[in-house]
Amino acid sequence: MATASAGIIVGCVSLGLGQQITSFVEILSGGNIFLLLLITALASLLLGMGLPTTANYIIMASLTAPILVQLASGIVVHGVALAVPLIAAHLYCFYFGILADDTPPVGLAAYAAAAIADTSPIATGIQGFLYDIRTAILPLMFIFNHDIILWGIDSVPEGIFLFFMTVLGCMSFASLTQGWFIAKNT
């Protein structure tokens, strides 16, 4: 069913709905990259609710990723023209689409976890989203720092160094937001 709905959305995009959505998002963002990223993230969260991973990617790749690539290419940040690689845009939209699985109110993963823990699905979804703040920040890094996705990295040692620094940064950020490092922080 979800894949069929993804096919309907892709069909609508091929009929010109994608251009209408792009112009609407362009008007809403007003050329502000942060507003553009926020609108794209919210659209990905809304469109990704209740979808399996494959259908989620099909929808994000056909609706939100082209918007991000097309509109971000004309934005200048601190005197430098922003160029968003296609892979960074796809990862950005896909991450937020997948985040919809544990974000209330739909949050299918939160409902499953709440049934196991015998708690409220909404409270479980909110707690899960707080644990996923790292996942909400990481796609922003894909857009502004292409090294994290190894875009333009020429040497293996540099790639290994970036990998370990990214893992260390994500672990540090997760321990900060969750209140744990080696022991519970009070």
What is each residue range found by the language model?
Residues 1-17, 37-50:
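Core transmembrane alpha-helical segments of multi-pass membrane transporters/permeases
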Residues 12-28, 146-156:
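Membrane-interface helix termini and inter-helical loops of multi-pass transporters
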Residues 95-185:
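Juxtamembrane and boundary regions of transmembrane helices in multi-pass small-molecule transporters
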Residues 1-5, 30-39, 130-138, 169:
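Hydrophobic alpha-helical transmembrane segments of multipass membrane transporters and ion channels
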Residues 53-96, 106-123:
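Hydrophobic transmembrane alpha-helices that form the pore/transport pathway of multi-pass ion
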Residues 33-47, 74-99, 123-134:
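Alpha-helical transmembrane segments of multi-pass membrane proteins
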Residues 8, 42-46, 66-67, 71, ...:
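Alpha-helical transmembrane segments of multipass membrane proteins
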Residues 46-55, 179-186:
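Membrane-helix interface "capping/anchor" motifs
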